[in-house]
Amino acid sequence: MGQKIHPTGFRLAVTRDWNSRWFASSGDYSRMLHEDLKVRDFLKKRLAHASVGRVVIERPAKNARITLFSARPGVVIGKKGEDIELLKRELQKIMGVPVHVNIEEVRKPEVDAKLIADSIAQQLEKRIMFRRAMKRAMQNAMRLGAQGIKIMSAGRLNGAEIARTEWYREGRVPLHTLRADIDYGVSEAKTTYGIIGIKVWVYKGEMLGRNERPAVVENENEARRGRRAPRNDAGDNRGAKRPARRTGAEQAGAGDKAGTRTRKAGVDDAAAVEKEVS
């Protein structure tokens, strides 16, 4: 069901793409998979304060290309590019192949689910009330174009003895609609009372699948003209008054007059025939 399954995995090959894009034989698959996991864990610790939302790993022809989606690319690059060069060398030691690092800037971090979850986790670690942090994040997301957002926090909230789960939602979040563009992110806040988990769902609107085409929306005026019945006459009769509807008595009187005219025409025809015979 859409309520239970991972939103990204549910939409793979429909509206979402994989975060690791490479092909390997059966012998190399497990090794490369473990390398990817090590790289992601390393980047998570190394770039914890760089607001990295997503990491995409590609392996073209005995090389590796890593794309970092960050809201603070200057922190990743460092002064005169020193930090990113050091990062490349460390990644090459882990993967064993030449590594190219690309950085993509996240223009609106307020509507990125992973960055929202990380922001709430940092606030909880600073002893900010969880309700205030969640509602502030929801307001910022809705203000910057999100059509819906849902945030869930679980653990010893506010240092309570018994762990519980609380969630808030604003707008609509259709988890079971495959064409819905839903961004999902998870983060953990390490507090003095224990770990608090944060999950965020952000609904950004509907998007087309890979093989779908946009529906053709015709002009409203043309659609209205197409539904209008054709006119009987070819001339332009705009502004002309329509004949008023006749009542039942008027219609009966018109029928009597028509019958009288028919009988009179018959008498005239008979008189003309007699005159010709004589």
Curated annotation (Swiss-Prot):
Query: Does the entry feature the keyword Ribosomal protein, yes or no?
Result: yes
Instruction: For this UniProt record, give its keywords in alphabetical order, as a comma-separated list.
Output: Ribonucleoprotein, Ribosomal protein, RNA-binding, rRNA-binding
Which Pfam families does this entry report, sorted A to Z? KH_2, Ribosomal_S3_C
User: Which GO BP terms, alphabetically?
Assistant: translation
Segments for region (Disordered): 217-278
* InterPro entries (UniProt xref): KH_dom (IPR004087), KH_dom-like_a/b (IPR015946), KH_dom_type_2 (IPR004044), KH_sf_prok-type (IPR009019), Ribosomal_S3_C_sf (IPR036419), Ribosomal_uS3_bac-typ (IPR005704), Ribosomal_uS3_C (IPR001351), Ribosomal_uS3_CS (IPR018280)
Query: What SMART domains does this protein's entry cite?
Result: KH (SM00322)
Query: In this protein, which residues make up the domain named KH type-2?
Result: 39-107
Coiled coil residues, start to end: none
Q: Which domain of life is it from?
A: Bacteria
Record's GO cellular component terms: cytosolic small ribosomal subunit
Identify the CDD domains for this entry: KH-II_30S_S3
GO MF terms listed in the record are: mRNA binding; rRNA binding; structural constituent of ribosome
Biased-composition ranges, Basic and acidic residues, are: 230-239
Its biological purpose = Binds the lower part of the 30S subunit head. Binds mRNA in the 70S ribosome, positioning it for translation.
How does the annotation summarize its subunit structure? Part of the 30S ribosomal subunit. Forms a tight complex with proteins S10 and S14.
Similarity annotation = Belongs to the universal ribosomal protein uS3 family.
Q: Which HAMAP family match?
A: Ribosomal_uS3_B (MF_01309_B)
Its name, as the record gives it, is Small ribosomal subunit protein uS3
Species whose genome carries this gene = Aromatoleum aromaticum (strain DSM 19018 / LMG 30748 / EbN1) (Azoarcus sp. (strain EbN1))
Q: Which gene encodes it?
A: rpsC
